[in-house]
């Protein structure tokens, strides 16, 4: 299926594909509750619904929410797409699987834009402005036996994500890796990231990772 995308909505890229592959390896029972955080075009949410899950998609962008609803309609599946800040719209909910592809690119000044395409990728001075919030909030939303899959750049420190999830009571590990060439966004931040020591002088490729956390019964 070719996904429709309104202007300004995050374009599915290598991180989307890596997370989708990791998701395909997870067991999804009929009627399982699956949450897609930072849904963008709704690729992961639609994939979950196709596996007969009860899919909920969250994004801060109105256009992303509308895009996801339209793509679910085109795919002939049901997805509940809601607008809001990370996990806030699903506070108090419980899920069997949580998928997250949050903004993770470090930016000079550390501020996240309130609007515009930069909101799709800018994530503070160390790229963890949203990752750390997710790590703190995810454990209480997972049912016993539930799993979280979170994709981000190795620049953000996969070990920090693992430790943060473990602090929340989950078992955690890096479940998938993929090395890709820097895209336009990362290339734009390269000089500053080199100044900050976030990447090496000769680095021109990025390692994407999927961190898997599980709420053991």
Placement of each model-derived feature along the sequence:
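Conserved SAM-binding strand-loop segment of SAM-dependent methyltransferases
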Residues: 76-86
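Conserved acidic residues
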Residues: 32, 96, 146
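Conserved Class I SAM-dependent methyltransferase catalytic core
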Residues: 128-186
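Mobile active-site "lid"/loop adjacent to the S-adenosyl-L-methionine
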Residues: 102-130
């Amino acid at each position: 299926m070719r996904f429709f995308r309104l202007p300004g909505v995050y374009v599915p890229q290598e991180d989307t594909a890596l997370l989708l592959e990791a998701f395909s390896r997870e067991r999804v029972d009929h009627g399982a509750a699956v949450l897609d955080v930072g849904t963008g075009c709704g690729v992961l949410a639609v994939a979950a619904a196709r596996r007969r899950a009860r899919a909920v998609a969250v994004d801060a962008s109105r256009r992303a929410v509308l895009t996801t609803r339209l793509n679910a309609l085109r795919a002939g599946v049901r997805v509940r797409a809601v607008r809001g800040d990370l996990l806030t719209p699903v506070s108090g909910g419980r899920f069997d699987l949580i998928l997250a592809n949050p903004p993770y690119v470090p930016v000079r000044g550390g501020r996240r834009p309130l609007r515009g395409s930069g909101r799709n990728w800018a994530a503070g001075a160390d790229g963890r402005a949203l990752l750390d919030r997710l790590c703190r909030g995810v454990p209480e939303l997972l049912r016993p036996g539930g799993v979280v899959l979170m994709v981000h750049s190795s620049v953000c420190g996969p070990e920090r994500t693992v430790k943060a999830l473990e602090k929340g009571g989950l078992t955690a590990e890096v479940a998938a890796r993929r090395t890709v060439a820097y895209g336009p966004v990362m290339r734009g931040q390269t000089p500053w990231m080199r100044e900050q020591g976030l990447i090496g002088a000769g680095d021109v490729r990025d390692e994407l990772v999927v961190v898997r956390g599980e709420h053991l019964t």
